[in-house]
A protein has these predicted regions:
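N-terminal presequence-like segments and the immediate start of the first folded domain
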Residues: 1-58, 62-75, 81-134
Length: 134
């Protein structure tokens, strides 16, 4: 029987308890991450475009790490951006700091906004643990 394990990194317990939001769920070797945004542990939106992108990726790293995964295990990436697509170049520069070896599939969307004012991007991904290159 395949098991379902909720992944809650240290510092994200409150969001799980309050909003019933699982940062990730592991089923077998597959890890499904919920969308991560540029908020700190106190749920404050990080100021500055690049800083917010970095924080969103650091939140992804934190969730991956809690499950024993890294960015090399990510096979699918989905990103949602606010209408200001002028920040795409900055996002690409930041993304390439995290994905340096194995590149995932990637789909990007433009949206009007997010549930919290000031959020510029949301990053969701899927990882498979124990992958090897062929």
């Amino acid at each position: 029987m395949t098991t379902r394990e909720v992944i809650i990194p240290k510092g994200m317990e409150n969001i799980y308890d309050t909003y019933h939001y699982a940062p990730a769920i592991r089923v077998g070797d597959t890890l499904y991450l919920s969308g991560q945004v540029g908020r700190d542990e106190n749920l404050n939106v990080v100021e500055g475009t690049e800083a917010q992108f970095v924080q969103a990726f650091e939140n992804v790293r934190k969730v991956l790490g809690a499950a024993g995964a890294t960015f090399d295990d990510v096979v699918e990436l989905e990103t949602w951006f606010t209408d200001d697509m002028n920040a795409l170049k900055t996002f690409l520069d930041v993304k390439d700091r995290y994905f340096t070896n194995r590149y995932p599939t990637w789909t990007g969307f433009a949206v009007k906004g997010f549930s919290m004012p000031g959020i510029l991007v949301e990053i969701k991904c899927k990882a498979v643990l124990g992958l090897s290159d062929t």
